[in-house]
Amino acid sequence: MKTVKKETIIEFEEKKSKFIGYIKPVSTVAEAEKFIDSIKQMHPNATHNVPLYRVMENGQEYFKYNDDGEPSNTAGKPMAEILNILDVYNVAIVATRYFGGIKLGAGGLIRNYAKTAKLAVNEAEITEYVEKSIFILDYDYEYTSEMEAFLNGNSQKFGIEILEKNYSNRVTMKISANDEIEKELNSLQKIIVIKM
């Protein structure tokens, strides 16, 4: 199964319409929907924010898209077809369009929304999907800089994403990462590691 390596943004203009493509690798439907909502909030005045996600979660495929007010099947569907052609999963995309005053027609919309998805996927780089797990890390405040250095230094290697940080008597952090990180985490001193 293939996905994309990184979150990224692409942008281009077509007949004065501005297209911005946002893409992010995701592991769950909830993560995809949160990403889509965050992009819509960034562009509340956009003419259209066309959402799309394709997620394999617990052995079930969730593939959802819509046209966000564009004529039927001229926005979400051509973007979805790009994911089918490239065989990419566990990804969320939002194509934001600002209308520039010149109508593109159905064919122009189809081409440009497909182009947005294709450019975004290519820029985010297709890679083999690696299953991620959730880890809870618990440690004393005095190890905060050491833990942050470890997580930052290994972010790419293990695909680390910090989901939550809580500071009370101790620091508790919830992360998503490739399973290979577990051995490294367990070798660290003075840290409690729980794999969810």
Which residue stretches match the model-derived regions?
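Ordered, amphipathic secondary-structure segments that act as subunit-interaction surfaces
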Residues: 63, 70-106
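Short amphipathic beta-strand starts and helix->beta connectors
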Residues: 4-8, 117-123, 149-161
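Long, charge-dense
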Residues: 114-132
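Short amphipathic alpha-helix segments
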Residues: 139-158, 182-184
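Non-DNA-binding regulatory cores of transcription-related proteins
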Residues: 160-178
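Short glycine-/aliphatic-rich beta-strand segments at the starts of folded cytosolic domains
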Residues: 127-141, 171-175
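C-terminal regulatory domains involved in ligand/effector binding and gene-expression control
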Residues: 1-73, 155, 162-164, 187-188, ...
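Conserved structured catalytic cores and adjacent interaction surfaces
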Residues: 108-110
